[in-house]
């Protein structure tokens, strides 16, 4: 192995981690693996080495007596191949790949949000069949609030005169025309005001009226 500084040697990159910023080179002459730091790589761009690539380097002794490779280049001074941003983290298929990440088959966009049976807009999800705002679901749908048989529909609790909850029409302080809140079967209906249809007074129903006949 070339022990003197300034004498170049050849070797193969054993491994290099971009994340850690260092790795090791195996010299061609069979010597011990040499430590190589990111700062010891000659490169105009990102300083990295690819596992298994052939390199040339100088050997330098550090203050602790250990040797390391410096001024590392490709063969005949050419640029190193580098890990191209990969080493240590690999180039795994993340987001967008099959079975992984957002938009991938089986992940994110299929079976997840907006997919069949799940997420927003999917069958059985929010806005879908059986979900909010449609058939059998939340507000505005069949069986939901504001829909057929839901809150405000088919009678329900609350005052049919003013539409407010918490009291009945007979206790309502507001006078008003018929056709109360809600939809099918809602109180109020036609036929004048929201009181007794016998005497026209507010505050009681016809069955409670004390005045004479109709």
Swiss-Prot record:
A zinc finger (CCHC-type) spans 157-174, 194-211. Residues 80-91 have a biased composition (Gly residues). InterPro entries: CSD (IPR011129), CSD_CS (IPR019844), CSP_DNA-bd (IPR002059), NA-bd_OB-fold (IPR012340), Znf_CCHC (IPR001878), Znf_CCHC_sf (IPR036875). The keyword Amino-acid biosynthesis does not apply. Residues 54-91 are annotated as: Disordered. Residues 8-75 form the CSD domain. PANTHER family: COLD SHOCK DOMAIN PROTEIN 2, COLD SHOCK DOMAIN-CONTAINING PROTEIN 4. This is Glycine-rich protein 2.
